[in-house]
Amino acid sequence: MCLDGDRPVGYARVVRFGNIEELTELMVDPEHQGRGVGRALLGRVWPGDPSPDLGRVVVATGAPADLSLYTNFGVMPAAGHWHLRQRTDDYLERRSKEIDAAEPAVHVLEADRAVAEWQRLEPEALGHERPAVHEFFGRERTCLACMDESTGRAAGLCWVSTDGEIGPAVGQEPKDVVPVVLAALDRVAMTQEPPQLGVFASTIAWWLLRRLRGLGFRVHWPGWVMSSEPIPGLDRYLPTRPPNLL
């Protein structure tokens, strides 16, 4: 935290998951921006350079100057990170007209099974494990899953909360994330009835983006996933909402 006298004017927070440190928050008071506060905070939470034993990742949604600042701390763009929105009534109307879309059945998983399936699928997509995150979601959110009939295991998973927060989601393959995300959107649209639906998606998740674009979703705010090393499976992954974590 950075203080001006007794007044907080900025703070940063890093969370470690195995061999990755994720910057989850970097905030500077508008009156103190442009004075090097952000750089100083980053220097405290991310000292030195990343290494093969301890990498770095951040979901960056700031201005161009902010993105340039992150590159000085060893992270580079891995993929775009789009906040997508659509009016709920328009979404439901478009979904009702989808007569060709034959989709796999989606089921609700019990919390213990959901956490186990997440611990199997997510590390292959992100390149690191986050068991504590999914143990928390197992208590706070519902896990939707489509199953691979040949193995009896989950092919796609998506967490959704009772207040309409969708994500993260992951699939064995890029196409497998689509049915669970749509099922989560359907669930929120019909039970919560918010004025708008929102999700985050990486710009290389083409299977998902194609379906969302066909349902009228538009880019509300662009950002970047920035990392010190390649992330192997962002094409089959839907980031967390709210976007403090990847």
Regions found by a protein language model. Give the residues of each.
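Amide-forming acyltransferase catalytic core, primarily the GNAT-like/NAT-type
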Residues: 53, 72-165
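Conserved GNAT acetyl-CoA-binding A-motif
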Residues: 23-24, 48-64, 191-203, 221-223
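Conserved beta-strand in the GNAT
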Residues: 1, 6-15, 22-27, 152-167
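Conserved active-site tyrosine of GNAT-family acetyltransferases
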Residues: 66-71, 75, 210-212
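Conserved catalytic-core motifs of GNAT/GCN5-like acyltransferases
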Residues: 19, 57-60, 76-91, 219-231
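N-terminal charged segments
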Residues: 112-149, 182, 186-190, 203-246
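Conserved acetyl-CoA-binding loop-helix of GNAT-fold acetyltransferases
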Residues: 25-28, 34-48, 67, 72, ...
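Flexible loop/N-cap segments at domain edges
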Residues: 140-146, 152-201
